[in-house]
Structure formats: C-alpha cells, structure tokens
Amino acid sequence: MMSTGFSWGTQALSESTEVNSGLGDLPTSIPRYTPNLKPVNNNHHSNGKKRRYSEDQESKVVKPTGNRKHYTTPSTYYKSKKSRTPKIMGQKLPINRLVEALDHTSLQRLLESLIHEHPEISNTIDKISPKPTLTDSIELIKQKFNSIMHHLPYKCDTESDYSYLRIKTHLNEFLNCLSDFILNFLPPIETNVFNSLKFLDEVTDLIHTLPNFSNSEFQYTKSMAYEQISNTWLIVLNHKMRPDDGTNNNNTSNTNEALSSSSSPSPVAQCNMENSAQLIKIIDELNLQQKLAKHDNMSIGKFKLVVEFVNSEIENYENFNHTVTNNGGILNDLITVDYSNFSIAARTSH
C-alpha cells in the first residue's frame, strides 16, 4: 500500500500490487517469511527509486530555486499588465455640454443663481447679452398674460374676489414684467420711435383684456397702470432730439414758431419739423389716431391727453404744409417778371 493516493505508478508497481494483493489485510508490524517473492522485492526496490525520482522532479517544478531570474510571480505579471492598460474612470460633463443639455427654464435658474452668488458679473452679462427684439419682448409679456388667464377658476365668477386671489401672484408678475419692458422701450434706451409706439399699443391692448375684477385693490392697480402707460405714450410722442445738444424739445412750440416767422426757420426748428414729419408718418402707418381713440374709450378717459397731443401734432403739421404752399405761391408771384420789354423788337423800337 505504498503508492496509495498517487496516480503516476509504473507497470512494475502494478505487478507488485497484484502479487501483494493476496496477502490480506495483515498488520504491517508482523514479520513474514516469503522466500518465493524475491523478484517482487527487486521490483519494489526499483519502484522506490522511481518514486523518489518523481518526488524530486515534483519538488523542482513546484519549488523553483532562487537562481532562476527569468521566473515571474503572478503578482508581478499582473502589475506589468495593469500598467499597460489605461485606467478608465467616470468624469463630469464639460461646461459647454452641460449648458447644451439644459432647457430654457433650467438655464434661466442657473443664471439667476450665478448672479445671486456673484453680483459683480451683472454688468458683464448686461454688456455681452444681445438686446431683446420687439417681437420677443411682446411674446414674453403675452406669456405672462396667458398665465393669468390659465389660472382663473372654472366653476366660479371670473370677476369675483376668489378669482382675483387665485391669479394675484401671476398678475403681479405680469405687471412687473410689463414695467421693466416699458422702461426698456423708452428713450434714450430705445431710439426707434416706431418700435416704442408699437410696443405701447400692444401692451395697452393687454391691459384692456384683463378681467375686470370687482376687487377694490385690483381696480386701483388697473387705474394706476392706465395712468403710467398713458404717460409713457406722451414721453415717446413728445420726444424730439435736437441735433446740437441732444436735449428734449417741445415740437409743437417750434412748429408754431416756424409758422409765425416770416423768415426762414432756424436749423433747430427745421430739424424738429423733419422729426414731426417722421412722427406723422409713423402715426399714419400704425393708425394711431384711431387706436388711441379706442384706448381712451376703453380706459374711460385715461388717454385723453395722448389723443389731444396726437390731434394737435397732425393739425399743426397740416397747417405748416398749407402755409408753406401759400407762401410759395406768393413768392412765385413776387418774382414773376414780364420779359416782353426785353425782346429784340422792343429794344429796336426805341
């Protein structure tokens, strides 16, 4: 039973096993006399040598000597393999990709938070930000207005106090936004009179369309809104820039001065007359005379001064054109000369 547990026995080992198999399970300490098994003992002696040789070979394979420098341990192999493979780790998005992924609302909140944390960048944003166009400005204010209408209760009187309380927050947001954009469309920030008047006409219509809540607070707020918008109409219509110093000048007084003067008008008066002609053209293009009359009727007389100013401008301009036409006819009569006396026949007759 010397080779129990091993699997690399030789043929001689098998023969020895067959011979010894008939001995039975006798104790190994009892000596026995077996004169006829000498060949078997020789085989057993040679088998022991083979087994020792196999164990020596196994020890050489499993336990290499320290002189073999080319042998690489598994840990060293893994380290060299790890150094050749780049380590891949997760990382955050670049700023440009992060901004691209944000929607309008998220980007707006991000900018507001950034300005809140760093107020010093407000001037920089104001300088590099593009100016909102007339169309975009009106569209934004209409969105604020639609927010009011969408939050009105369905099963309740539209003009009740309950309805007003439901939309009060959205109404304040609408009026605040309206106030900011009105100031942005006033001179000298906005130099295009057409854009200013077009904007004022659009927002005045929105004020008319607001539900007429019976709440006294709303009635006061609406009345104040009409008065402020009416004043901005007058500011834009009466804004005439002088070419010399850029200060405001009353166009009506200069028109009357030009009409009453028998001599040619001064350069300032002439410039104001040109501005007045441009204003009359814009009033005609926007049909403001009729629209302002409607605004005055809808606001119960809040635009009376604006209507009177526009009518006065139109009347003065028509009077000026009529005066220039008449003066031109008189001047033509004064310089008319009878050239018949200077004919060759008349000169020879003398």
Swiss-Prot record:
Keywords: Cytoplasm, Nucleus, Protein transport, Transport
Disulfide bonding pattern of the chain: none
UniProt region (Disordered), positions on chain: 17-84, 244-269
Tagged with keyword Transport: yes
Cellular component GO terms held in the UniProt record: cytoplasm; nuclear membrane
UniProt KW Electron transport keyword: no
Role, per record: Involved in ubiquitin-mediated protein degradation. Regulatory factor in the ubiquitin/proteasome pathway that controls the turnover of proteasome substrates. Targets proteasomes to the nucleus and facilitates the degradation of nuclear proteins.
UniProt name for this protein: Tethering factor for nuclear proteasome STS1
Organism: Debaryomyces hansenii (strain ATCC 36239 / CBS 767 / BCRC 21394 / JCM 1990 / NBRC 0083 / IGC 2968) (Yeast)
Gene that encodes the chain: STS1
